[in-house]
Amino acid sequence: MNNNDQIVWCDIPVKDLDRAIKFYGAVLDQPIKKESHEGMSFGLLPHPHDGVGGCLVISKEAQPSANGPLVYLNCINRLDAAIAAVEKNGGKILQPKHQIGPYGSRAVILDSEGNRIALHSK
């Protein structure tokens, strides 16, 4: 992460942490590490040590929602495989894969918890 990054972290709210870890592990084709810190369990999304990251978290303050900010997850070189894993793992395709100008392609999905998420590839 450099000092010019505007987004540095995201928490994706979930209802069932184990179900969400399974869903995101399948869609991203990477292990989601379950951790616990100060009595709070969360699923750590893969990210470089010095890069933008995020986690799956159960929270009283935030509930899964299809309304609100749209988080884009990196599916570079495997967007089609990620999309194919969505419905098999309890999600739903809201917008099929489409071009977003010079910024690549995306599909907008509903994850296993009810969050609207974009899967993105350049």
Spans of features found by a protein language model:
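Vicinal oxygen chelate
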Residues: Q6-K15, E61-E87, S105-L110
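Conserved active-site tyrosine of GNAT-family acetyltransferases
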Residues: A20-Y24, V86, G114
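Active-site beta-strand termini and strand-to-loop segments that position acidic
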Residues: L45-H49, I109-S112, K122
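Short, charged/polar, Gly/Pro-enriched secondary-structure boundary elements
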Residues: D50-G54, N115-I117
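Short acidic/glycine-enriched loop/turn segments that link adjacent beta-strands
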Residues: H37-S41, I100-S105
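Core segments of cupin and vicinal oxygen chelate
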Residues: N2, D11-V52
